[in-house]
Regions:
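ATP/NTP phosphate-donor binding region
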Residues: 1-71, 272
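Accessory alpha-helical/coil subdomains and C-terminal extensions
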Residues: 2, 7-11, 15, 27-38, ...
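Short beta-strand segments
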Residues: 7-9, 81-83, 107-110, 142-146, ...
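Short acidic, glycine/serine/threonine-rich loops at helix termini
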Residues: 17-20, 92-93, 118-121, 151-157, ...
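Short Gly/Thr/Asp-enriched flexible loops that form oxyanion-binding sites at enzyme active sites
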Residues: 82-104, 244-253
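Short, acidic/small-residue loops that bind anionic groups at enzyme active sites
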Residues: 92-123, 130-136, 257-268
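Internal gly/pro-rich beta-alpha loop/helix module
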Residues: 108-179
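C-terminal non-catalytic interaction/assembly regions of soluble proteins
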Residues: 239-334
């Protein structure tokens, strides 16, 4: 029988209603009490490194969570992380980079309604997460939600209230869980199967900013982003179009920061199908003039957290580029 560790961090799944609205109050042990049926296929222990609304998550929380998994890694066959849905995709992505090539599954789940409500989605999500964590075919970091297993770098919350809150962006789901039965569609990659042990990382550079272009956007805003961040993710239009000309002044701002150790990544505001800056002149001219990284089919969550990991490891421009384009947990199709 598999031995699974529940790591409770708060979120809606652990919330109760007070005079100021929902807030996390339910303990890890109490969460397990709602799903006694998991004892039929695994044994479960629990820890609770923090109990927060996931809106308040910081890189320090992520490092604490990764450390909890690292410290318990040898003692368990898998891990289930209860988490708020609002930033779950960010946490799943960052764990993919902080704990690479894990043969043991690290499964995030949560709910759109608190676990103590009669019409909640929490109990089935939690049960499914344990089923997936106990499966012989699962590995790496995933989100299990509404019966779908989604790679940690491909998940995005696309609905604020519906139970079917998450989708896998530009990549198939890894598998499904129905009535405790796991159907695995995509096997773990060879890099995971061949790994003797996972690669654990213990640092993040939180100075990564996401800057979204809008018609009328001021170059002064981009300048402030460069001033206050080590990397800027510039979200352009369509396939990665970046406006030129004196009105926007973006070229002059980027020229100003050129050679000052800043990393610039261009992505798209469109959720599906990624960037392709070579199609239109507004993208091609920009990419040819400046040394920028292009995100292609990566999600915002993966771009940002991957940069946090990379910049904590190196500031060498060539090494940053190499690591950025190195696929991790299905984050990039090359």
């Amino acid at each position: 029988m598999k031995k699974i560790l529940l790591i409770a961090t708060g979120g809606t799944i652990a919330s109760t209603t007070g005079k100021h609205g929902l807030s996390p109050t339910v303990s890890a042990g109490e969460l397990l009490g709602f799903v006694p049926e998991i004892n039929n296929f695994c044994t479960a222990d629990y820890i609770q490194p923090y109990n927060i609304d996931s809106t308040n998550i910081t890189p320090a929380h992520w490092l604490k969570l990764a450390a909890a998994i690292r410290e318990n890694y040898d003692d368990y066959d898998g891990f289930v992380v209860c988490h708020g849905t609002d930033t779950m995709a960010y946490t799943a992505a960052v764990l993919s980079y902080l704990i690479q090539n894990s043969k043991k599954p690290i499964v995030l789940t949560g709910s759109q309604k608190p676990i103590d409500l009669e019409d909640t989605d929490a109990r089935i999500n939690l049960r499914d997460a344990f089923s997936y964590a106990a499966s012989d075919k699962s590995a790496q970091t995933t989100i299990v939600f509404q019966g779908k297993a989604i790679a940690g770098t491909r998940a995005k919350k696309i609905r604020t209230k519906s139970f079917n809150a998450f989708e896998s962006v530009d990549f198939p789901i890894l598998g499904t869980v129905r009535d405790g039965r796991v159907v695995q569609y995509i096997e773990p990659p060879e890099s995971v199967k061949k790994a003797v042990s996972p690669a654990f990382y213990e640092r993040l550079d939180g100075r990564v900013g996401l800057c979204c272009l809008t018609p009328g956007f001021s170059g002064a805003v981009l300048d402030a982003y460069f001033e206050n961040n080590d990397a800027v993710v510039l979200s352009g239009y369509g396939t990665g179009g970046i406006p030129g000309g004196e009105y926007y002044d973006l070229y002059d701002v980027i020229e100003k920061w050129r050679g000052k150790g800043k990393t610039l990544v261009v992505t798209t505001q469109v959720q599906s199908e990624g960037s392709d800056m070579g199609i239109y002149r507004v993208g091609r001219d920009f990419k040819e003039r400046f040394s920028v990284l292009e995100s292609y089919d990566m999600t915002w969550e993966s771009i940002i957290t991957k940069l946090m990991w990379i910049l904590s490891e190196t500031r060498d421009e060539k090494e940053i580029e190499r690591l950025f384009y190195k696929p991790v947990n299905y984050d990039l199709i090359v």
